[in-house]
Amino acid sequence: MESLGLQTVTLSDGTTAYVQQAIKGEKLLEGQVIQLEDGTTAYIHQVTIQKESFSFEDGQPVQLEDGSMAYIHHTPKEGYDPSALEAVQLEDGSTAYIHHPVSVPPDSTILAVQTEVGLEDLAAEEEEGFGADTVVALEQYASKVLHDSPASHNGKGQQVGDRAFRCGYKGCGRLYTTAHHLKVHERAHTGDRSYRCDFPSCGKAFATGYGLKSHVRTHTGEKPYKCPEELCSKAFKTSGDLQKHVRTHTGERPFRCPFEGCGRSFTTSNIRKVHVRTHTGERPYTCPEPHCGRGFTSATNYKNHVRIHTGEKPYVCTVPGCGKRFTEYSSLYKHHVVHTHCKPYTCSSCGKTYRQTSTLAMHKRSAHGELEATEESEQALYEQQQLEAASAAEESPSPKPTHIAYLSEVKEESSDIPTQVAMVTEEDGAPQVALITQDGTQQVSLSPEDLQALGSAISVVTQHRSTTLTIPGHQEELATSGTHTVTMVSADGTQTQPVTIITSGALVTEDSSVASLHHQQVALLATANGTHIAVQLEDQQTLEEVISVATSAMQQGAVTLETTESGC
């Protein structure tokens, strides 16, 4: 501690003041009587007070006189460029080292490090951080930029290496801004998990109190973080999960790939971290199975792969009568749309619909050259469209439907395809086809997006054969009342049973019965007991898959499967 010489001055009113010991070379003596400027008399008493020395935290950022930022360290950090370190003496006599972060010119052509995407943001922001290979590769890119770039710049270069604390465990090398964050990270190496869940039969342990608090909410069901969007009612266990969700509304992608020429951006740093490994070639997760040794860029892909060896399939379809199991959640999600007949994602360029955003994004990239289309961007766009559609639906009245009935007659001796009625409901001129059993029980509704209009072909699938009923597609041909006949065509092209179509109000002409076909199809599984299930055909979907899906749906009982305009 440092001593300062002060003198106390007792004023005439009894109050005490402190006077610095030396005033312009003069010395005030103990007990001396002095007269102050306001005319009052004071007595001098000398005392000693202690001034606490100012201590710096290791790695603390400080602002220098020239306005630049530096970092204080008690000892030189391993791996730092000696030319970027400056030894200084603190007031308490100790020596510290100031680290001046390296600046990268913004016009660099090897590696562009944006202001909000410095290398320090790339290292271990979440549970999984970058491995040492990735960090080294990025630093090599940055150092090459410094070596090849001119020394002079406009002073607005981006700081690299702000993370002052590097993990010393072999093969790790992850970087952190504070000693506390490094200490928390090191628990992943030591296995220290002192925060344990108290719920019965759980006993999970965590490295941080925040991790435990978030986990406990899986037991309590608490979701305190609610989406602020007016039309969205979702809530989340953690603020981080809420922040990621909000970006689906705003379209924000704050985490950009730092590699020049890539330009991709992501909603979370973890997704970006995995993406960067496609540039560096790092695959930190290796399959331990003998004779396998496959490497993966993410822990999720690694875990899914390991289940191939173990045979574990933890994700089960909950649809009654199905019970299929999958090794990964994404496969279960994709499987579920088979039961819902849902293709909610529509291409804005050509109108094709898809079940997954990943398939739509791949279609946009290959068919329309939209290289920036990704699974996340299409999901965000879809959710925004859903919100707009919900808002518009509240303002517009429901249209009144009109009906056109189609009756198909099949020979009684043919038990494979029982008699059925297909009814077309026109709402605002848009036809909607419903398949109805002989006893009048409606089984499924098919939207205009599923059929593309009346011109779509309906495949009637049985356990023994597949036939196609062609319905004319041009609405101007629905002109006069009457009865007309079209022909059902088998899979090999052979004409089979004639089908009579009875229309009311609007008609189909006989000579155009096979005039128009559209690329989309709906498969109808017909059984001897009169049960009908319609299944939307996907590209390259096999007949076996169609029968499997429809059979599973029929096991649920005779229920009405209503669909929206996009089949959901």
From Swiss-Prot:
Compartmental location: Nucleus
Zinc finger (C2H2-type): 165-189, 195-219, 225-249, 255-279, 285-309, 315-339, 345-368
Ranges of Low complexity composition bias in the record: 379-396
Keyword Oxidoreductase annotated: no
Region span, 3 X 12 AA approximate repeats: 34-99
Keywords: DNA-binding, Isopeptide bond, Metal-binding, Nucleus, Repeat, Transcription, Transcription regulation, Ubl conjugation, Zinc, Zinc-finger
InterPro entries, per database record: Znf_C2H2_sf (IPR036236), Znf_C2H2_type (IPR013087)
GO BP field: positive regulation of transcription by RNA polymerase II; regulation of transcription by RNA polymerase II
Record-linked PROSITE patterns: ZINC_FINGER_C2H2_1, ZINC_FINGER_C2H2_2
One Pfam short name: zf-C2H2
A GO-annotated cellular component: nucleus
Annotated stretches, region: Disordered: 365-401
Transcription regulation keyword on record: yes
Domain of life: Eukaryota
GO molecular function, one term: zinc ion binding
Renumbered ranges of Sequence repeats: 34-45, 62-73, 88-99
Main location: nucleus
SUPFAM superfamilies found in the cross-reference section: beta-beta-alpha zinc fingers
Signal peptide positions on this chain: none
Linked residues for Glycyl lysine isopeptide (Lys-Gly) (interchain with G-Cter in SUMO2): K24
Described function: May be involved in transcriptional regulation.
Protein family per UniProt: Belongs to the krueppel C2H2-type zinc-finger protein family.
Protein name: Zinc finger protein 76
Source organism of the structure: Rattus norvegicus
